[in-house]
Curated annotation (Swiss-Prot):
Name the record gives this protein: Transcriptional regulatory protein FlgR
Annotated function: Member of the two-component regulatory system FlgR/FlgS that induces the transcriptional induction of the genes needed in motility and flagellar biogenesis. Upon phosphorylation by FlgS, functions as a transcriptional regulator and activates transcription of RpoN-dependent flagellar genes.
Disulfide bonds: none
Originating gene: flgR
UniProt organism field: Helicobacter pylori (strain ATCC 700392 / 26695)
PTM field: Phosphorylated by FlgS.
Length: 381
């Protein structure tokens, strides 16, 4: 197993190198910063272990640029709940706060190694379905109230802002609103503001004419135009660069765009749904988000409760995911023991549905018996 360690602290980096030298089945390549790692990472690597707080580029931005190509583990000396949640959102398998026992990190590495080896031996005929992005897997009183609000606003053209923690299902709600609207037969286009580098975001949204910049060898339609007559979903809207917010405000108000390198405006007919897990009042007070744009986008706010407030959904979602994974990998039927079920119900799920689905998939693969035990979940309570 080939592992990249990205750590700016030379003492920590050397300590990990020395510790892992004792493991004959692990090949370690260390980097002092994400930039060096990005230049060298290739298909031969299986796992990336990265710090978060590093100069020039932090670990979370580094992971976003990797786009899930590698399994990942985060180590940091300044852990916060928000960083842990952001890590889960980016698909990080484990999160260690310094100082930590290297033996625990090693255990996490070998769990990941076992999953990767299993997946290589049992390649899927087709990727696991992701129904959580397009439909609701379970029901609860809190969820039904949010669905009622979404259904009511779907028949209108009002802009909607979906509020809630990362992983609660905001994209599911965006699809739900689109599917129950008069625009359902037209495009639904989603764009994550934090997933596209800032220097590319404007051209992706607005499009460009030939010659607008060095690499613009042909005209390209932007996402706003592509969504015409349909819905555009602006995920993580709070991360939109400030200088682009004024341009978005004009699009929302005037329903027209101008491609880069052009002086001619184009009318568009789109419905805006945005989503965020940020405190927008704080963003506005800090002058990181325009208040006028906020009011234009949040005509109808819908708050989606976190999974820990929708406890009755946890086991149904877990059981659906467990069956899906077992069927996909031909593992035979598996179930949760009473203790495992109790653990799932009592865990806080700061990563919400996204975290739950990942935990269940890992447990299904790693468990040796037909009944998944609490120890197979690897959840700290």
């Amino acid at each position: 197993m080939k592992i990249a360690i990205v750590e700016d602290d030379i003492n920590m980096r050397k300590s990990l190198e020395l510790f892992f030298e004792l493991q004959d089945d692990l090949e370690i390549v260390s980097f002092k910063n994400p930039k060096d790692a990005l230049a060298k990472l290739d298909e031969s690597f299986d796992l990336v272990i990265t710090d978060i707080n590093m100069p020039h580029m932090d670990g979370l931005e580094f992971l976003r640029l990797l786009e899930g190509k590698y399994e990942s583990i985060v180590i940091t000396g300044n852990a916060t709940l928000n960083k842990a949640i952001d890590s889960i959102r980016l698909g990080v398998k484990d999160f260690f706060q310094k100082p930590f026992k290297p033996e625990l990190l090693l255990e996490s590495i070998y769990r990941t190694k076992k999953v990767l080896e299993f997946q290589k031996k049992h390649p899927l005929e087709k990727p696991l379905k992701k129904p959580h992005k397009h439909s609701f897997l379970a029901a609860s009183k809190a969820l039904e109230e949010s669905k009622r609000q979404a259904l009511k606003v779907a028949s209108t053209d009002a802009n909607v802002m979906l509020l809630g923690e990362s992983g609660v299902g905001k994209e599911v709600f965006a699809h739900f609103i689109h599917q129950h609207s008069q625009r359902s037969k037209h495009p639904f286009i989603a764009i994550n503001m934090s997933a596209i580098p800032e220097h590319l975001l404007e051209s992706e949204l607005f499009g460009y004419q030939k010659g607008a910049f060095t690499d613009a060898t042909a005209p390209k339609m932007g996402l706003f135009e592509s969504a015409n007559k349909g819905t555009i979903f602006l995920d993580e809207i709070a991360e939109m660069p400030l200088q682009l917010q004024s341009k978005l405000l004009r699009v929302v108000q005037e329903k027209e765009i101008t491609r880069l390198g052009d002086n001619k405006s184009v009318k568009i007919d789109v419905r805006f749904i945005s989503a965020t897990n940020a405190n927008m009042k704080e963003k506005i007070a800090a002058k990181e988000f325009r208040e006028d744009l906020f009011f234009r986008l949040q005509i109808v706010p819908i708050t989606i409760a976190p999974l820990r407030e929708r406890v009755e959904e946890i086991l149904p979602i877990a059981e659906i995911k467990l069956k899906e994974v077992c069927d996909a990998y031909h593992l035979g039927p598996k179930s949760f023991s009473k203790n495992a079920a109790k653990c799932l119900l009592e865990y806080s799920w700061h990563g919400n549905v996204r975290e739950l689905l990942g935990v269940v998939e890992r447990a299904a693969i790693l468990s040796e018996e037909t009944e998944i035990q609490e120890k197979d979940l690897f959840l700290e309570r």
